[in-house]
């Protein structure tokens, strides 16, 4: 009896060992397959830096944004990038057939966060360094290579204008950007940054110190960290158009102390607008002022802030009468006002976690541009948008919870998402304008316009029915669950930019000089505004749509008043 029992016990032990071995082999095989999939999906190279690590370069002027249905068919998008996105989206989370806005809002926001992770991993590597023998100027450059110069982030060598392009920066692209704005010199730094100016740096360094390859041009040198590859701009590429030399700003009364208000001047007979603008551009001033035969160059200042314009007929007199009347004509030169272009991450983690919350299409990107240039600190984002990062929003790639940015963009609503923040700026825009702006963005990107076929299709009414209620619930949720709020209306920000922006900056607990606010006002549009208007603007809202939206407007207006805020601006409220 004991012998069979012993045999059975021995068999069970062997079976147990065999099962353990098979389980271990199964787990190891699965792990190896998973690692192989990750290696295929993500580019080879160093690991991405942690969320609190400083990223290598500022953002850019062009590049691939979020991978929507249009980007999947874009030949410029690499197969590796598409494969990586495909790996991150399981079959259960892939988009359903039909327009994107027919999916639930939460599903769309989750996909934004997935894309953030992939873009963070794929773009985190710095620009490749070239060996000393490869450090050479671009062969196809239309400018004259001057040399390699040192640069300082706090005191730029070329101070005229700044552009970024993390994916496509080339020497020709930088030269054209500077030539369009009438600059003489173009400097490239860290493979993706372009600086313009009219004054050549004083001290050069060895050519071997400029050893970073241009992001969009293999084998060409685009400076290095704190090193500029400087070219003299000779001519524009074919098809490029030079910007207007001067834009009329209005007729203004002269300040009391002209010498103090206007740092540079030119007095000559028969001076013209072009002559004065060219002179001030050479001196790197954004304003050219004409008073009779006198030309002055200046920045907007508290003494000369360009807010109290006179009737243009006052400046239409002959030069001598105009000079005696103490009036002047002001023109904007192609030169960028760079007093407020420097930005950085917060030196220490912020103790107050601030949201910049809005409904999509309410001007969140524009508000971020204003806040960044007013405070000098980057703004973050709950999502990742490669197009915004490429346009200079460097905080876009920083983890939204890093607390290294002055505030964090979000379109989220709901108690859990709202209570993660200590305070918030709630940006509200007329829902009619917001819905049109967001529909344009979804159909044609940040700077484009939806085609007529989009407005006439079933996509537009489906979009309105889905998103109009979100406009209302977004405001109501933030009023209900927000711990500390500042309500800002987009229309008021456009009408009274400096006072409203001053209030926003004070809410963020940042001290800002009046000169910096005036600089922001001078550069208020930035690079993310739809230029011009459509040849014909359709009336997209049917009477049924208007009844629906007007009901939401009344609800939000009453909720604001119930929470001791002023109601919506009069142009929102239906009459």
Curated annotation (Swiss-Prot):
Which organism is the protein's source? Homo sapiens (Human)
Organism lineage string: Eukaryota, Metazoa, Chordata, Craniata, Vertebrata
Reactions accelerated catalytically: a ganglioside GM1b + 3'-phosphoadenylyl sulfate = an 8-O-sulfo-ganglioside GM1b + adenosine 3',5'-bisphosphate + H(+)
All ranges on the Cytoplasmic side of the membrane: 1-14
Q: Which residues cross the membrane?
A: 15-35
Protein name, UniProt field: Sialate:O-sulfotransferase 1
GO molecular function list: sulfotransferase activity
Its membrane topology, per UniProt? Single-pass type II membrane protein
The entry's localization annotation reads: Golgi apparatus membrane
Q: Which family does it belong to?
A: Belongs to the WSCD family.
Spans within the Extracellular topological domain: 36-575
Gene3D superfamilies to which the protein is assigned, alphabetical: P-loop containing nucleotide triphosphate hydrolases
Record Pfam families: Sulfotransfer_1, WSC
